[in-house]
Amino acid sequence: MGQKTAVGSLLKSIGNSGQGKVVAGWGAVPVMAFVGVLLLVFLVILLQIYNQSLLLQGFSVDWNGVN
């Protein structure tokens, strides 16, 4: 089929090293929770700007200019 190279063998050993194994403990859950909270805050700010419940000086939300 194909030739075996040193780089290919190295990448294969790195890629398959953790296959089928579950890390004990919480793993990446705290990081994902933090990212989820940041996304939620961002979406709430966008919703407040859209509903004009968050007023910014010098910034008006007017959809008449949108074509």
Swiss-Prot record:
The keyword Repeat does not apply. SUPFAM superfamilies: Photosystem II 10 kDa phosphoprotein PsbH. One of its GO terms (biological process) is photosynthesis. GO terms for molecular function: phosphate ion binding. Its main location: membrane. It is found in: Cellular thylakoid membrane. The chain crosses the membrane at residues 27-47. InterPro entries: PSII_PsbH, PSII_PsbH_sf. It comes from the Bacteria. It is a single-pass membrane protein. Pfam families: PsbH. Keywords: Membrane, Photosynthesis, Photosystem II, Thylakoid, Transmembrane, Transmembrane helix. GO terms for cellular component: photosystem II; plasma membrane-derived thylakoid membrane. One of the components of the core complex of photosystem II (PSII), required for its stability and/or assembly. PSII is a light-driven water:plastoquinone oxidoreductase that uses light energy to abstract electrons from H(2)O, generating O(2) and a proton gradient subsequently used for ATP formation. It consists of a core antenna complex that captures photons, and an electron transfer chain that converts photonic excitation into a charge separation. Belongs to the PsbH family. PSII is composed of 1 copy each of membrane proteins PsbA, PsbB, PsbC, PsbD, PsbE, PsbF, PsbH, PsbI, PsbJ, PsbK, PsbL, PsbM, PsbT, PsbX, PsbY, Psb30/Ycf12, peripheral proteins PsbO, CyanoQ (PsbQ), PsbU, PsbV and a large number of cofactors. It forms dimeric complexes. This is Photosystem II reaction center protein H.
